[in-house]
Structure formats: C-alpha cells, structure tokens
C-alpha cells in the first residue's frame, strides 16, 4: 500500500514517461513489417510488454532487453498461427488489436485471453464487426468477453459498420487489420465518434509504417474511414513521445500545490487527446507555461469550476475530478458514458472514493458534478486495480489533511512503473509498505 501525508511543496524536473498508446501501436505495426524496426524510448510497462508478448506469439522476433530501444523483426505481413493460447495479461489494447490481426494467420485458430479483469471487458462490438468482414471470431463463453477464439480467414467483405461511441480500440483493431484485405474497404460509423484522438494516434503510427487511412467527413463530422487494399507494413525507426495522460497527475499537483516544477517530453504538436489537460487547467485559472517540449508550473493557482466535455479524453476524468474538488464553484464532467468501460467504472469509483475524503460529488449517467470543497481529509482508498485511480488519488492524498492510504499500487506497472519514485523525487511525502 501507499501511505501519503500532506505535502507542502513540490519542486524539480521530471520526464514524462513514454506514451502507452504510441508504444502499443508502434510495436504491433513493427511486428507486421517486412524487415527490422526499432522502437526508441518505448514504455517498458506491463501493458506494453503484453503487446510485445502477443506480437511474438504471432511470429515476430522482438528483443526488448534494452529498455531504451526495442528491436523488432517483423513477420513479413504474415502473422503466424500461435502455438499456445495468447495471454495478454491486463492489456485491453493488446487484446482488441490482436483479435483483429489474429484473423490473418494462415491456418487454424488463435485463442486470446487475459487476467481476471480483462475477461470482463466488452468485446462483442469488435467481434460483430469482424463477422461483418467474413471473419469468424467469437467469445468462448458466448457472452462477448474473453477468451476470444479467432479462425484464420480472408477478409471477404469490404464494408463494416460500427458504433463510434463505444471503445475506439475496436476501430483501431479494424484499421490495423483491414489493410490485409485484397479490396479497398470502408469503416462506417453508425454513431458520433468518441475518443477520436486515439484514432488520430493510430492513423499517425500506421502512416509511419507504410499504411494509409483516409478520413471522410460529412458536414464537418467524421463519418467513415477508407482503407486501400493490399497494403504492406514497412519497417521504421520509431521514437515514442511522452505520455500526456501520465503527465496530467504532475500537472494537477503543480497547479494545486506550492510548486516549481518542469515536466519534459510533452510536445505542443502532440496528437494525444490528453494533452487537453493543459487547456483545461488554463481555463480553470492556472497560467502554466508551455514550451515546445515541456511544461513549467509555479503554483499554487486559484482554480474555478468549469464544464468539461470528456468525449475525447476519458483517461483524464480522475485527474479532473481531483482538480474539481479544489476549484471554486462547480465542475461538471459530461459526455463520458464510455468512462465506465475502462479498467473499472471510473465514474463510480471517483464518486465513491473521493466522497470518503470529504468531496461533494454527484454521479450522473455520463459524468460527475463536483462541488468545490477546497479541502480533503485523508482516507483509505480502493483503486479497483486501476492504474489511473492510483495516480490520481495519490495527488488527492498529497493535498489532504492527515494520512491517506491507497491500496493496489502495483496497478501503476500498467502505464507508469516508476510513478512513486518520480513523484517522490519532486517532494511528495510518500512511503510504501
């Protein structure tokens, strides 16, 4: 467990960890290429290593012993039939992307599963989409969750329709699978898209590895994606940028506390949706300094509550919830039904756990209404095996009066293995027992 005492001041320079989203996509694209790629500055986390393991099961050769550079020999656009069940641990991204890719094995079946949390995550929308393409993919339990069984087979149809307001990972999986088709093909969105920046990341990484995706808009709304057939993944030397989601906890701590911190490896031109945290804290009243590749914060700042649409930034919800507790007035988080489909129901978890600390939060179907109380009290916090809750609640504990105990700190291995060391390095009053 993590034990946190109120922290009076934070000071220093930290480097944002490499992006989890970019690392996943880059290593899987490299694993399909017709040559040798390098992934430079990858995120060496449990989730991303699940993608390494899964890609190797499908025929890639990957040397991940150097934590600063992974060397990937691709399977030459020909995934191999795995010789065992593909266990992807706790990585939903890996499960969803490789479910599509696994359909391109030459014979037999691929079975994909994971830990006790992963086998509860919804998969049916992706399975239905793959079935539309003529691919046989189904839940072994017939309930739309892993274990997932995928049969080898060519893509027979060239149009797939899928909701845009569920998980963008389903669409990412289709984008990375459909270039194997002999035909030009189309992904049509049947509902407005949420988490669009994650698809921009997918398209950006695919482009670097030689695969092109065209976006089509109707009345300024994204409605479909067009994917040319017979495309081939090409090798590439890919450098992973910093993770804005992980940086958000340091940004929150910086604006709330007496601080003088610099966060490196966060780029102004990033396609990551979670870079929106910079705009959010500015709108709330924190004039933080942005440079080309870093953020400088000299807090504390007096924040005011605002309304925040989290359609494209679901991973920021726990961070925003903490900020709202200390802002003057009301902070409303809305358009976040999909936040309930993450590692846990994050809307429920934030409302329930922060209330223990004295927060005034009303849970809504699509978000949270947070009345700024200006003060929290230490409490014992459950984190539901969710890495983002561990990190957000740590910031809450640093601001709270008294002692805060956070359970399940091992979850940070998913996205930010050295989180505790990093936040201690700038002055957080934390011990681990």
UniProtKB/Swiss-Prot annotation:
Phosphoenolpyruvate binds at residues 20, 92, 121, 169, 346, 388. Its EC number is 2.5.1.19. GO terms for molecular function: 3-phosphoshikimate 1-carboxyvinyltransferase activity. The keyword Amino-acid biosynthesis applies. It comes from the Archaea. Pathway: Metabolic intermediate biosynthesis; chorismate biosynthesis. GO terms for biological process: amino acid biosynthetic process; aromatic amino acid family biosynthetic process; chorismate biosynthetic process. Keywords: Amino-acid biosynthesis, Aromatic amino acid biosynthesis, Cytoplasm, Transferase. 3-phosphoshikimate binds at residues 20-21, 25, 167-169, 195, 315, 342. One of its GO terms (cellular component) is cytoplasm. The active site is at residue 315. It is found in: Cytoplasm. It catalyses: 3-phosphoshikimate + phosphoenolpyruvate = 5-O-(1-carboxyvinyl)-3-phosphoshikimate + phosphate. It holds the Pfam family EPSP_synthase. The keyword Transmembrane helix does not apply. Its main location: cytoplasm. NCBIfam families: aroA (TIGR01356). Catalyzes the transfer of the enolpyruvyl moiety of phosphoenolpyruvate (PEP) to the 5-hydroxyl of shikimate-3-phosphate (S3P) to produce enolpyruvyl shikimate-3-phosphate and inorganic phosphate. PANTHER family: AROM/DEHYDROQUINATE SYNTHASE, PENTAFUNCTIONAL AROM POLYPEPTIDE. Monomer. Belongs to the EPSP synthase family. This is 3-phosphoshikimate 1-carboxyvinyltransferase. The gene is aroA.
